[in-house]
């Protein structure tokens, strides 16, 4: 077979043969096989050219995708599949990129976790979930997590939460709110409780009284329309307890209020 045309088409070249066959190849393919118009190639050589062209095209696509930011093996593999590249060729491209250090799931996971240590607010459980979604193996994630201490991150988040809710919630509700937020962000209950216990979060009696009477004003208006006497007192006690107030504070406030 003889090459009758080599024509540049954007990022690829169109190669036509005298038997009517056509295929798109990369510039790397032309250089590797020293292709030119009128060159004669065999069926075997054509197969090698086509395979390498797919590999070269896939690698170029992957490198373009990686040029914007680091990606995991799973992300690159899924990106290449959009271009209908043969699965075997995709695996070859991935293996080549890993060998050349363009893809390294361990480094990717380390970078994400380390960035979180410096300025993030996520605990190990959420990070594990996010990294697993990127295709990183559980064993790789666990190995890297073992190198980090999340107590400082938990403390940083707890301090921010304290600033947000202090003076707005009674002591028990404040504790519940901060611990719940920490566990939602991926910290264990144990670590969340330690972070809370290290806060300077004393809610003084005057603040508690102010908060409880403010809440009573709102709830009394709501329940006094339907209840009175003992039933009203019970309803108010229940709603205040759900809001996080201690029963002793509730009883004291109701004695003054009713």
Curated annotation (Swiss-Prot):
InterPro entries: RecX_HTH_1st, RecX_HTH_2nd, RecX_HTH_3rd, Regulatory_RecX, WH-like_DNA-bd_sf
Keyword terms of this UniProt record: Cytoplasm
Coiled-coil regions listed in the entry: none
One of the GO biological process terms: regulation of DNA repair
UniProt cross-references to Gene3D superfamilies, sorted A to Z: Winged helix-like DNA-binding domain superfamily/Winged helix DNA-binding domain
GO cellular component, as recorded: cytoplasm
Entry's localization field: Cytoplasm
Keyword Signal (UniProt): no
PANTHER family according to UniProt: REGULATORY PROTEIN RECX FAMILY PROTEIN
Function: Modulates RecA activity.
Family to which this protein belongs: Belongs to the RecX family.
Protein name per its UniProtKB record: Regulatory protein RecX
Organism: Streptococcus pneumoniae serotype 4 (strain ATCC BAA-334 / TIGR4)
Underlying gene: recX
